[in-house]
Amino acid sequence: MALSRRLRLRLCARLPDFFLLLLFRGCVIEAVNLKSSNRNPVVHEFESVELSCIITDSQTNDPRIEWKKIQDGQTTYVYFDNKIQGDLAGRTDVFGKTSLRIWNVTRSDSAIYRCEVVALNDRKEVDELTIELIVQVKPVAPVCRVPKAVPVGKAATLQCQESEGYPRPYYSWYRNDVPLPTDSRANPRFQNSSFHVNSETGTLVFSAVHKEDSGQYYCIASNDAGAARCEGQDMEVYDLNIAGIIGGVLVVLIVLAVITMGICCAYRRGCFISSKQDGESYKSPGKHEGVNYIRTSEEGDFRHKSSFVI
């Protein structure tokens, strides 16, 4: 008797919890709810990816499912009226009734995708969730610019650029297949060099080159999707020939002096005068035949005298 009385008391004490549980379950079942196994999938270009959208609770046997793509402020349909739409047609299918599988993804597939479910038999008829898809792109061979020759003690800049990779790649430089540190002072092996590598911009800057900096240089662009390198290019560091430079300057000065003296001598000899008039070379106008010129008493007054020639 005492045992059955205690059991009845326990059951009575638990009755309110039981009814609350039924009420709670009724509320959940009457509202459609969604979940995803991965809200932020990351995939490499040309691979496949699943966009998970799972109905956890619903009383509607055949809810309406729609997928939309949100990119650059524009919203387009991906799955509507039980059909794949837009540029995903032909490489996307539906699995698990509400989830999407995209084959051969491209960089243009990077976007926010929204799964929308309408369950008309549920008290809460609509639920939605968003998934952000990131497509990583492997870098292509970067463009490298390496000076062919630099004099000792001068500054030099080597450049490396790549524009296809996503996320944005980082850069590393190699000399004769040996990786260069970001700062030459950080490695005793490069104590005779003075350079700095910017892994974000891809520049390798020498403040002053030394003979030891001669060699073959190449750059590698890397990100989470892969890496690519440019072809190696040689850079020669040479000594300045001071004696040769001084000799060349002297030769130029001597040549200029000789040319100047030649011009002066030619000018003195009259080579640059086109015509010359003096007393010896001047000729008076010839007399006209049949006309005599008679000077009168007044200076410079001339008059004509006619004559006949028989």
UniProtKB/Swiss-Prot annotation:
Residues 139-236 form the Ig-like C2-type domain. GO terms for cellular component: bicellular tight junction; cell-cell contact zone; cell-cell junction; desmosome; extracellular space; filamentous actin; microvillus; paranodal junction. The chain crosses the membrane at residues 242-262. Glycans are attached at residues 104, 192. Residues 35-127 form the Ig-like V-type domain. Keywords: Cell adhesion, Cell junction, Cell membrane, Differentiation, Disulfide bond, Glycoprotein, Immunoglobulin domain, Lipoprotein, Membrane, Palmitate, Secreted, Signal, Spermatogenesis, Tight junction, Transmembrane, Transmembrane helix. Residues 32-241 are extracellular. GO terms for molecular function: cell-cell adhesion mediator activity; identical protein binding; integrin binding; protein heterodimerization activity; protein homodimerization activity. Disulfide bonds join 53-115, 160-219. Pfam families: Ig_3, V-set. It is a single-pass type I membrane protein. Residues 1-31 form the signal peptide. PROSITE patterns: IG_LIKE (PS50835). Proteolytically cleaved from endothelial cells surface into a soluble form by ADAM10 and ADAM17; the release of soluble JAM3 is increased by pro-inflammatory factors. S-palmitoylated by ZDHHC7. S-palmitoylation promotes expression at tight junctions. The keyword Glycoprotein applies. Its main location: membrane. It comes from the Eukaryota. One of its GO terms (biological process) is cell adhesion. InterPro entries: Ig-like_dom, Ig-like_dom_sf, Ig-like_fold, Ig_sub, Ig_sub2, Ig_V-set, JAM-C. Interacts with ITGAM. Interacts with GORASP2. Junctional adhesion protein that mediates heterotypic cell-cell interactions with its cognate receptor JAM2 to regulate different cellular processes. Plays a role in homing and mobilization of hematopoietic stem and progenitor cells within the bone marrow. At the surface of bone marrow stromal cells, it contributes to the retention of the hematopoietic stem and progenitor cells expressing JAM3. Plays a central role in leukocytes extravasation by facilitating transmigration through the endothelium. The Ig-like V-type domain mediates interaction with JAM2. This is Junctional adhesion molecule C. It comes from Rattus norvegicus (Rat).
